[in-house]
């Protein structure tokens, strides 16, 4: 049974978060966030299909597929670090290196994400000052999960968080997530960043499979304005601190985890669609007895048009 709980990205054991105003947006709104795990994590990710991919997308794709483990994600809002060329990639490296130093972990264990204005270089002096402050007050509670969720917002009217708990062989396992997205919402996926944390012990390849399998029927099924973003990113970090027997095959326990992760993605997708720029209501269409997935998708596209 999937039980909804509070806590967002801090609901799962061993995860801390923080969000603050570094000054990127030139106002009092929070614009930098950190999600950190006490233990190394298996990581999975899905990314934009736009031909123009922002520097953080390229950076994270490489780390998710090549790093032995991941332990933190640092995010800035206000500037997307998209269409920024080689300088943009250098900024990603600098963010990872400085965040790693501040946390005492390797740069290769730090994922980065950016959202905001396209075509503008990151103000690295401001960002580096924010990076130095983020670990100071990070904590594993609802308040700091909320601060992080607020800090990743751009045109969103409210923050978006979900968390659930399931039972795997008598062991409570938790999954929590936060996301942002309001405009440029169109598969695949939308202008959105999504960060999911779990204390489940699960094989990295199965974690990626569970994420990828659920994305098509959740985030890739929402649309607001038909625009596909340069920065779309969904990341999942699993630190294994629940203490369950590691999930290493597609058995009943994998199915339980998959269903819970799917639920998280589905609920976050609805929050994004409901907060779309110019939207006044959210329609949910249920298609019953569609013979094949193609019919399902065609009906979805028609409903968007």
Model feature map: region roles:
Residues 73, 78-86, 108-129, 223-246, ...:
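Short, surface-exposed loop/turn segments at secondary-structure boundaries that line and modulate
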Residues 102, 107-216:
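Glycine-rich, mobile lid/loop segments that gate access to catalytic sites or pores
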Residues 295-302:
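Conserved small/polar residues in nucleotide/adenosyl-binding loops
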Residues 105-111, 140-149, 162-163, 219-231, ...:
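Flexible, glycine/charged-enriched surface loops at secondary-structure junctions
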Residues 1-47:
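N-terminal amphipathic/basic leader segments beginning at the initiator methionine
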Residues 222-223, 241-249, 253-273:
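Glycine- and Gly-Pro-enriched alpha-helical subdomains that act as flexible
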Residues 53-63, 89-102, 208-221, 260-269:
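Short, well-ordered amphipathic alpha-helical segments that serve as non-catalytic structural scaffolds
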């Amino acid at each position: 049974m999937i039980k909804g709980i509070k806590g967002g990205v801090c609901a799962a054991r061993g995860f801390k978060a923080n969000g603050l105003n570094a000054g990127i947006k030139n106002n009092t709104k929070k614009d930098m966030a950190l999600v950190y795990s006490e233990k190394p994590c298996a990581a999975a990710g899905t990314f934009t299909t736009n031909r123009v991919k922002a520097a953080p997308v390229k950076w994270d794709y490489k780390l998710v597929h090549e790093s032995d483990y991941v332990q933190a994600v640092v995010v800035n809002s206000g500037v997307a670090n998209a269409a920024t060329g080689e300088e943009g990639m250098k900024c990603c490296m600098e963010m990872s290196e400085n965040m790693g130093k501040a946390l005492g972990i390797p740069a290769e264990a730090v994922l980065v994400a950016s959202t905001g204005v396209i075509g503008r270089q990151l103000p690295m002096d401001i960002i580096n000052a924010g990076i130095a402050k983020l670990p100071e007050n990070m904590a594993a509670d609802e308040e700091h999960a909320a601060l992080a969720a607020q800090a990743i917002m751009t045109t969103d009217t409210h923050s978006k968080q979900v968390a659930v708990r399931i039972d795997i062989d008598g062991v409570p396992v938790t999954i929590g997530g936060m996301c942002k997205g309001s405009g440029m919402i169109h598969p695949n996926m939308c202008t959105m960043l999504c960060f999911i944390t779990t204390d489940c012990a699960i094989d990295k390849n199965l974690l990626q499979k569970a994420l990828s399998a659920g994305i098509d029927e959740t985030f890739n099924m929402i649309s607001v304005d038909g625009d596909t973003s340069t920065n779309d990113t969904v990341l999942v970090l699993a630190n294994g601190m629940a203490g369950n027997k590691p999930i290493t095959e597609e058995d009943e326990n994998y199915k339980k985890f998959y269903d819970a992760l799917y639920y998280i993605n589905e609920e976050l997708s609805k929050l994004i669609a409901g907060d779309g720029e110019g939207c006044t209501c959210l329609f949910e269409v249920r298609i019953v007895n569609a013979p094949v997935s193609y019919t399902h998708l065609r009906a979805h596209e028609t409903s968007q048009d």
